[in-house]
């Protein structure tokens, strides 16, 4: 039987929620991943060092006994952010600030309205070596939802990189050929996280044969040509600039199967197996370890995990749903098969 042993991976983009939801989902990530970069878009958002440290304590309390999993904490960038906050964050071990353009995604109401007014804050991030994590979509209602990432590149990303050229930027959950091209052409201070859904699915999987709410995420799934461009990027000559970030974003089944369903796919349960499928299909299984376990750690300036995990070429059936507080949660590929299984 084919096996693949790799350095334990890290999830560089994860939503863990809070309260009972946190307790339900944290163990799935802790089983596979050594660390995860925790998104700060709670209600209310994680905007201060005190908020982040309190949230980290709640995450640690939700982990299974004996777990070595480490949450890497971030702050939610707001219009009120200051260079002093950046210095405080650095001193407290916060790894990054996250940009949510106001209204772009789940719990982004407190997001930034004009990033260019925060240039002194970004300059302090560059000085302190704190990363800038970007949800790269414009929110202009005149821009089609399928074009919002591409529009962001010209309107925001390129001008910011020109003004703060040494800022370390992660273009999060990229979905387009344009975003991949930007990262490939930019300096070594720019990298990207890529989700399993944007490597495996296209917008037909969302809309053909009926609306499939469990495939609805933001940024929304794109054309097949964009999916192919992402696979080419994560397996190509400059693959070191791309890394694993699931954007696993749990919402109760009732909130997804809804007249106004929530955006987000829950992939944490079988994340590394889904990525293994991507790399296997691309004939690049030998590049999975770098993508999952090395590139993100190197970009964040942290050592790789010291232990390993082993994947077995053995099919598994993903549960139709799992418990989630008082409700249930539908995982990515619910009821379907994945050709790989982690040996626990």
Swiss-Prot record:
Biological process GO terms, please? 'de novo' pyrimidine nucleobase biosynthetic process; 'de novo' UMP biosynthetic process
- Pathway(s) annotated for this protein in UniProt: Pyrimidine metabolism; UMP biosynthesis via de novo pathway; (S)-dihydroorotate from bicarbonate: step 3/3
InterPro entries noted in UniProt: Amidohydro-rel, DHOdimr, Dihydroorotase_CS, Metal_Hydrolase
Pfam families for this protein: Amidohydro_1 (PF01979)
Cofactor: binding details: Binds 2 Zn(2+) ions per subunit.
The record lists its disulfide bonds as: none
List cofactor names only.
Zn(2+)
Q: Which residues form the active site?
A: 247
Which superkingdom heads the taxonomic lineage of this protein's source? Bacteria
Which enzyme type, at the first EC level? hydrolase
Q: A GO molecular-function term, please?
A: dihydroorotase activity
Q: Which residues bind substrate?
A: 15-17, 41, 135, 218, 251, 263
UniProt keywords (A-Z) are: Hydrolase, Metal-binding, Pyrimidine biosynthesis, Zinc
Q: What is its EC number?
A: 3.5.2.3
Tell me yes or no: is Zinc among this UniProt entry's keywords. yes
A single Gene Ontology CC annotation of this entry is: cytoplasm
What does the entry list as the binding residues for Zn(2+) 2? 98, 135, 173
Q: Which residues bind Zn(2+) 1?
A: 13, 15, 98, 247
Q: Which Gene3D superfamilies match?
A: Metal-dependent hydrolases
Residues annotated as carrying N6-carboxylysine in the record are 98
Name the catalysed reactions. Answer: (S)-dihydroorotate + H2O = N-carbamoyl-L-aspartate + H(+)
Assembly, per entry: Homodimer.
Family the UniProt entry places it in: Belongs to the metallo-dependent hydrolases superfamily. DHOase family. Class II DHOase subfamily.
Its function, per the record, reads: Catalyzes the reversible cyclization of carbamoyl aspartate to dihydroorotate.
Q: What is the name attached to this protein's record?
A: Dihydroorotase
């Amino acid at each position: 039987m084919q096996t693949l042993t790799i350095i334990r991976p890290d999830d560089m983009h994860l939503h863990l929620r809070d309260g009972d939801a946190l307790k339900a989902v944290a163990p799935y990530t802790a089983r596979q991943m050594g660390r995860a970069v925790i998104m700060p878009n709670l209600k209310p958002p994680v905007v201060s060092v005190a908020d982040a440290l309190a949230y980290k304590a709640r995450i640690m309390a939700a982990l299974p006994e004996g777990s070595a999993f480490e949450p890497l904490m971030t702050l939610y960038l707001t219009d009120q952010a200051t260079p002093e906050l950046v210095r405080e964050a650095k001193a407290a071990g916060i790894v990054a600030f996250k940009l949510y353009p106001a209204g772009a995604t789940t719990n982004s109401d407190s997001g930034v309205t004009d990033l260019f007014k925060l240039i002194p804050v970004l300059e302090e991030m560059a000085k302190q070596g704190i990363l800038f994590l970007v949800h790269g979509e414009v929110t202009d209602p005149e821009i089609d939802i399928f074009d919002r990432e591409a529009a962001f590149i010209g309107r925001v990303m390129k001008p910011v990189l020109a003004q703060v050229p040494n800022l370390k930027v992660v273009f999060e959950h990229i979905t387009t050929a344009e975003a991949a091209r930007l990262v490939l052409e930019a300096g070594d201070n720019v990298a990207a996280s890529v989700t399993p859904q944007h490597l495996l699915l296209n917008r037909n999987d969302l809309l053909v044969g009926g609306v499939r709410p469990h495939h609805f995420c933001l940024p929304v799934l794109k054309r097949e040509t964009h999916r192919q461009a992402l696979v080419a990027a994560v397996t190509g000559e400059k693959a070191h600039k791309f890394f694993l970030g699931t954007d696993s974003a749990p919402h109760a089944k009732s909130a997804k199967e809804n007249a106004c369903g929530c955006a987000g796919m829950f992939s944490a349960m079988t994340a590394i197996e889904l990525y293994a499928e991507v790399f296997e299909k691309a004939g690049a299984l030998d590049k999975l370890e770098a993508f999952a376990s090395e590139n993100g750690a190197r970009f964040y300036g942290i050592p790789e995990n010291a232990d390993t995990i082993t994947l077995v070429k053995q099919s598994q059936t993903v549960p139709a749903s799992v418990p989630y507080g008082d409700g249930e949660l539908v995982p990515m590929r619910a009821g379907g098969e994945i050709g790989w299984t982690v040996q626990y």
